[in-house]
Amino acid sequence: MTKVEYKHTHIAAKKKLGQNFLLDKNIPRKIVRESGIKEGDLVLEIGPGFGALSTAILEVMPSFTAIEKDPELARFIREEHPEINLIEGDFLKVPLEPLTGSGKLAVLGNIPYSITSPILFRLLDNRHLIESATLMMQHEVAQRITAVPGTKEYGILAVQMQAFCDVKYLFKVGRAVFKPRPEVDSAVIRLVPKAQNPVEDSEGFRTFVRRAFHQRRKTLWNNLKEYYNTSEVPAETLKLRAEALTVEGLIELFEKLTPIDHALNDPETRNGIE
């Protein structure tokens, strides 16, 4: 177990919480600049830890809200930054709507690698409450979110996030600026939910995407034939693999499909990212 010291406070990094503390001052300031937040915005930080990003946010605004699951770190933040409205709890469970007031949330965070997928889908499910999300995460996941068709990174996560959000890869962060030092690099991305949903049936689309990419080497026809009536889809399209279609192309395909009532059970868990 690695103990991290910061301002005479010793806290053991908890592996089960995926804790890797950012102790660099310049990177948090860059994250804040890239987020575009300004005084008066409704800011929510996910997992402030020792407050590296929190301190940078406070350089822009006098107060904001943060959610911290670790009781030791929550106590540290309360003592170190009493101006922060700290909620001690699990971001995956804390109701977000009461935090919005009359506006939308600008979310920032250095999110744990171990729960990146659940956090992303929680944000996606609550995108009507979100103005933007500027997040640091595992570099590989950031690449997959921002991937383009025809690449090995392009898959379920890219399509599901890009369908409902404008996504942008901002910059890479080396592993040496964290303690404990992770085995992989990180990256910062920005998500901005789209004003209009591209599809009426969001849940149906997510299920379709999982099925389309379930076995990447198979054609769309082979992956979808058990679940949908494809009579309205051109044969040329069904001969392709899912990775060949753009997000817009996959949305267009989904709109032409009719579910088969006796379709087999879904092959993937809802929040799986391949």
Curated annotation (Swiss-Prot):
Binding of S-adenosyl-L-methionine, residues: 20, 22, 47, 68, 90, 110
Annotated catalysed reactions: adenosine(1518)/adenosine(1519) in 16S rRNA + 4 S-adenosyl-L-methionine = N(6)-dimethyladenosine(1518)/N(6)-dimethyladenosine(1519) in 16S rRNA + 4 S-adenosyl-L-homocysteine + 4 H(+)
Keywords attached to this entry: Cytoplasm, Methyltransferase, RNA-binding, rRNA processing, S-adenosyl-L-methionine, Transferase
Record-linked Pfam families: RrnaAD
Subcellular location: Cytoplasm
Lineage: Bacteria, Pseudomonadati, Chlorobiota, Chlorobiia, Chlorobiales
Alphabetical list of CDD domains matching this protein: AdoMet_MTases
Membrane-crossing segments per the record: none
Family: Belongs to the class I-like SAM-binding methyltransferase superfamily. rRNA adenine N(6)-methyltransferase family. RsmA subfamily.
Stated name of the protein: Ribosomal RNA small subunit methyltransferase A
